[in-house]
Amino acid sequence: NYPVQLLLEPLIGAIAGGNVAVLKPSEFTPHVESVMVRLIKEAFDSRYVSVVTGDYQVNQALLDLRFDYIFFTGSVNVGKIVMEKASHHLTPLTLELGGKSPVIVDETANLKLAAKRIAWGKFMNAGQTCVAPDYVMVHHSVYEAFLKELQTVIKSFYGDNIQSNPEFGRIVTTRHASRLADLIEGNRDQVVMGGAVDLEDRFIEPTVFKEVTLTSSLMEDELFGPLLPTMSYQSMDEIKRCLKAHPNPLAFYVFSENKAFSHQLITQFSFGGGCINDTITHVASSRLPFGGVGSSGMGRYHGEASFKTFTYEKSMVNRSTKIHLNLVFPPYKDKLKLIKKIMK
């Protein structure tokens, strides 16, 4: 996702820290890859910044080399491979991964605004955003009203013929589109909006699912597409049970006018970052370090955090030569009384 931004943003931090860098763009976006190769060659001396292209075999060969630092953005499974390879050389690294980022909507939330901001965060880039809302839990007393608002918002965003709307994107590969299509077909009975698929066009319609359970295939892995499972809840225990089944998400979103409720959620559960009464926007601030925790990644970047990621602090002492205390040097026998007096 975002192959230009996710290549250049870490590079800025690396250059700011005085490093040379090797870039490896995603092989799933070949046109972007070719453009980036050209631009990087035009802008940088290859002794300082170079680009390597190729498939997973090139990735494996690259990871066999010794680097001072590795920065990886991608899936959890590939992140594990990168970390295992880095361990051979004890290379420090940052992993920007993903996970099932939840949205919690309570009974005090502004439903119209919640629906709009959730739909915007979910369906931009056809759902292919690492911090996109992955599923929504809504208080049972406002669940049906929320679903109605959500459907209204999606229609207002993209119209009746979403496939012909140039503002709605496509899935990056046919393989990923097929994966999403299978999830839709396997959960067709719970679709309340959307569900259309055109694999040749790599089009997956924004699709909303109703009353999804924790055992559903939709709740197994990060969806990374325009599929939005929803479920109702009645108690905090139900929320906790769901969040514990999918721990350490990259993002966490709460929609509520109840400050105590929001505070309870964001302090009790571990996640990378998030928003109260919004989605996605925490990523846009250069003042806020961005990154995951646990299975959603490790390390932080953006703004000053990027500089800190690609540098390390050296602890140094510069002693004066004008003053010299013989007290610290042996033999200590004659100095013991003085030392005890000082220590009192």
Language model: regions and residue ranges:
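Conserved C-terminal structural/oligomerization subdomain of aldehyde/semialdehyde dehydrogenase
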Residues: 203-344
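Alpha-helix/helix-capping structural signal
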Residues: 76, 141, 257-260
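Short hydrophobic/charged patches on amphipathic alpha-helices used for structural packing
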Residues: 59-60, 115, 240, 263
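Rossmann-like NAD(P) dinucleotide-binding subdomain of oxidoreductase/dehydrogenase enzymes
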Residues: 1-113
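Residue-level signal for inorganic ion chemistry
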Residues: 18, 49, 70, 99, ...
